[in-house]
Amino acid sequence: MSRIAKNSIKISNEISCKFENGTFFAKGKLGEMTLPVDSEYFVDISSDEIFVKPRNEKGKLNPKWGTIRSLISNIIKGVSEGFSKTLELNGTGYRASISGSILKLQLGFSHDINYSVPKEVKVECPKQNIIKLSSYSKEILGATAAKIRSYRKPEPFKGKGIKYENEFIFRKEGKKK
């Protein structure tokens, strides 16, 4: 039996949840999200907590049970608090600026990179070398941050590139004479 799946998910009064026709719905102050749930499981919603349970207790319980519980937990946290990631640009002349929904990146190429940010993600550039991303969807936020980081991954010799806020870049020694 999955240890994660046995735990309940606490919900606050400001979030409304329902489970209909194999789909979980959640609505909070930051937005609303849905999740299709496998037919082998159902979601039991009480006033202040949620349980994910298998429909057939005697059958083989597979790893999807804990995954579904974690996805629902992320949805609840997303619509109530939201998620955020911070990216740092390290390198001479590396900068970022935002205009509307276009993120303009100068990363040492002969041209600027214009990245169209998804509407679910909010972007801020408090400094020229810092990008703050926030969203109610952990999946979209992670994909957006990974796509921005992929334009110039940190290299191990000088550490130049785009990295996550607390990411450690393993440094290598250069050539020896």
Give the label of every model feature segment.
Residues 1-177:
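Ribosome-associated RNA-binding proteins
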